Amino acid sequence: AGVGGALGGQYLSGQGPVLVLNGDLISSVDVTALVVQHEATGAKATLSLWEVEDPSRFGVCDLDESGMIGRFQEKPEPGTEFSNLINAGCYLIERDVLSNLSSDKHSMEREVFPGLAEAGGMSGLAFTGYFVDAGTPDSFIEAAQVCIANGRYDSGRVEGDSWFGEDSN
């Protein structure tokens, strides 16, 4: 159904903003800092942002000095990007934005984020540390290496640059 369809308001209960994490990434984003930024700006959505050399695989954000995102463009053609700051796949979004979405297929990045940014309702928080989008075979291996290097596993053992599950030989 796309991320937007899966987040459609009919599936949500509770109060306050919704934390969304893309399932194919590893990062060191500080969610508490993201919440503080979201509350301080009063934004409808607050995105974690990461700087990359080639942003063509990602959504690109134009962040101003007050922490607001003025433009959002999903997967720009190489050479057309206006920034190297990308959506790092962890964001807070207000429930009223989601309540307007149906369960049909929606792309948050193509249908929701650009309008929120243009309307002045989107903030961003750039972070440092590590970020790996594990959407390709090579980046999946890189993500595993980042997890090993940063102790991001809760079972098994590490030998050299390899991780082994609890019952593996």
Language model: regions and residue ranges:
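Glycine-rich "substrate-gating" loop/helix at the edge of Rossmann-like oxidoreductase active sites
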Residues: 1, 80, 128-132
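A generic fold-level signal
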Residues: 13, 55-56, 64, 83-85, ...
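Left-handed beta-helix
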Residues: 33, 40-41, 66-68, 95-169
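Short, well-ordered turn and helix-capping elements at secondary-structure junctions
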Residues: 49-50, 73-77, 162, 168
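Short, flexible, basic/aromatic active-site loop/helix in glycosyltransferases
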Residues: 63-81
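Short glycine- and hydrophobic/aromatic-rich loop-to-beta-strand nucleating segment
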Residues: 88-93
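Residues immediately flanking
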Residues: 23, 94-95
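Conserved beta-loop-beta/alpha segment of the NTase-like Rossmann-fold superfamily
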Residues: 1-65, 101-102
